[in-house]
């Protein structure tokens, strides 16, 4: 809840001529508007333009509204919080701000574009009638003029972000949780959402599954690619989705790593079921039909928004010793990392050696430049002609020695083997460095300590550019990478399940060491017993005449032999 407003400052403030109170506004309340999203901003701006009327329904990032106003659109922003509405009216004097419940707002004039990218959950007001989800969708559809468009994001209650959530006490701690989250009303699937909008008189142009979360989507999958397990984009999508979930859930407490759930769903063609939400673009029938082709996949990363079939130039420039670069090369091939994981699980050392040797020969002997110098094994696809880079976001400003490139890739693979708890032929290795040395030996290379530290430093630079780490976070991240050993939990997304697995591995290692100590003690005791018995027999022989005779004969034999 916000702090109590300063009444003197409120009275002295100039009147807001662009603020209209429609009734049902929430007074001592504020909504979080989230952060700017490149993907949503691009989709919205493609439908906006000079002179077009736009209704932004509910809380949205301030940058999205500013971009609409900057494009020349006539923007109306509806907010249920009076405090938020006053703040928005002061920050954007050129737009009209409506404050109140969605059900009381006068939307009879209609709009050329209706944007509800924040969903329908925050359109109702506690001070007004609680409209059902179907009624909210109907009012949104009715607000669209003929030939106008609706851009709507709808939360998926079965999404991976809800399934892995680990936030005890959120219902009592979060003020926004006054509305029940486990609602039985409204669309619960993408097909139900599109059917409802169609029944409301709209024509659905595109219906995407949004990942990883509806409030900040980074990947949109739709069209024929959604659910198609035979699509050549599948291996590339696994890499893209893994990166998106890593960025979204890095350092957040979760029940289990969402990347595993999404990866399994993607392999089964069920990614729509676990998507964070569904983004629907629809239009109201009019005199002209929109002539536009919709991409099946849209991706947003640190460089900008792009599609796999027509990669557009992203943000250029340098970050530390890295150069921003975008490589999008989806191929119908397995990922090299998946191939190596399967071979490790099968303990097929011969084929594992062949794959690593082929990767080492692909790198070459000289310094490596371009995207392949920083490509992870998960970014590489396997083809008949050898490895290919399917996805890359960075290139080194200067060429990197091939030995460092090889060591970094194999060391990172060793870290994933250990932290993910994946089976491999060398379970008794003491650390990721030892396992990386074994893998490097399969390529006929040795691994020196300075080479390993240089490879880890390079990984820290990449992670810093990718996740925006500060100096203190860099140092902590570097120390964590150096300390990876059996029993270490994942360093990026450590869920409760993964922490439990890591604890079990630590206990197993401890019990194994205790069993080894007990076995060593038993061996030592048995050998001590045997030595004591032999010593007793020797002393017994020395005390008898027969034993003494044998000892004298032995000494005489030695003297004669000399």
Label for each model-derived stretch:
Residues 22-25, 30-53:
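Conserved alpha-helix/loop element of class I SAM-dependent methyltransferases that forms part
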Residues 182-209:
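Short alpha-helix
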Residues 220-324:
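C-terminal lobe and adjacent flexible extensions of AdoMet/dcAdoMet transferase-like proteins
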Residues 128-149:
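A short glycine-rich, Lys/Arg-flanked "PGG" loop and its adjoining helix->strand segment in the class I
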Residues 465-562:
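Boundary detector for helix-to-coil junctions that initiate low-complexity/charged tails
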């Amino acid at each position: 809840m916000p702090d109590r407003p300063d009444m003197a400052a409120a009275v002295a403030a100039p009147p807001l001529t662009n603020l209209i109170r429609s009734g049902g506004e929430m007074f001592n309340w504020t909504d979080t508007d989230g952060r700017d999203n490149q993907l949503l901003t691009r989709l919205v701006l493609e439908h906006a333009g000079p002179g077009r009327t736009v209704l932004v329904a509910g809380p949205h990032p301030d940058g999205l509204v500013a971009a609409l106003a900057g494009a020349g659109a006539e923007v109306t922003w509806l907010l249920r919080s009076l405090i938020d509405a006053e703040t928005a009216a002061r920050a954007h004097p050129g737009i009209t701000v409506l404050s109140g419940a969605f059900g009381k707002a006068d939307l009879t004039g209609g709009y050329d574009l209706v944007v509800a990218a924040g969903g329908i959950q925050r359109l109702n007001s506690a001070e007004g009638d609680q409209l059902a989800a179907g009624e909210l969708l109907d009012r949104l559809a009715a607000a669209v003029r003929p030939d106008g468009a609706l851009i709507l994001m709808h939360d998926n209650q079965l999404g991976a972000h809800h399934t892995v959530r680990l936030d005890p006490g959120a219902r009592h701690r979060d003020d926004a949780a006054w509305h029940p989250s486990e609602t039985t009303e409204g669309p619960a699937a993408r097909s139900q959402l599109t059917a409802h909008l169609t029944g409301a008189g709209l024509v659905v142009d595109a219906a995407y599954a949004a990942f990883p979360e509806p409030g900040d989507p980074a990947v949109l999958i739709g069209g024929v690619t959604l659910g198609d397990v035979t699509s050549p984009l599948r291996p590339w999508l696994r890499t893209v989705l893994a990166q998106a979930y890593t960025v979204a859930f890095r350092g957040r407490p979760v029940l289990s790593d969402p990347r595993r759930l999404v990866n399994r769903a993607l392999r089964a063609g069920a990614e729509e079921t676990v998507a964070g939400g569904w983004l629907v673009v629809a239009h109201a029938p009019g005199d002209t039909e929109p002539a536009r082709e919709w991409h099946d996949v849209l991706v947003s990363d640190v460089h900008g928004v792009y599609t796999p079939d027509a990669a557009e130039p992203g943000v250029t420039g340098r970050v530390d010793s890295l150069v921003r670069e975008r490589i999008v090369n989806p191929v119908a091939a397995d990922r090299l990392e998946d191939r190596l994981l399967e071979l490790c699980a099968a303990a097929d050392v011969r084929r594992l050696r062949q794959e690593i040797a082929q990767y080492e020969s692909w790198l070459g002997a000289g310094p490596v430049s371009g995207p392949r110098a920083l490509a992870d094994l998960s970014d590489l696809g396997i083809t008949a002609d050898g490895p290919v880079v399917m996805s890359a976001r960075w290139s080194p400003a200067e060429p990197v020695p091939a030995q460092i490139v090889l060591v970094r890739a194999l060391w990172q693979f060793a870290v994933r083997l250990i932290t993910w708890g994946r089976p491999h032929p060398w379970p008794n290795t003491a650390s990721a460095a030892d396992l990386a040395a074994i893998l490097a030996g399969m390529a006929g290379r040795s691994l020196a300590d300075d080479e390993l530290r240089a490879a880890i430093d390079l990984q820290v630079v990449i992670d810093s550019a990718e996740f925006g780490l500060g100096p203190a976070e860099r140092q902590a991240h570097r120390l964590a990478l150096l300390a990876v050993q059996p029993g270490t939990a994942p360093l990026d997304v450590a869920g409760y399940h993964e922490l439990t697995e890591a604890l079990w591995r630590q206990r197993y290692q401890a019990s194994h060491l205790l069993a080894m100590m007990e076995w060593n003690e038993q061996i030592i005791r048995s050998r001590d017993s045997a030595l004591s018995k032999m010593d007793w027999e020797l002393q017994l022989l020395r005390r008898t005449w027969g034993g003494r005779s044998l000892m004298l004969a032995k000494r005489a034999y030695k003297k004669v032999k000399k």
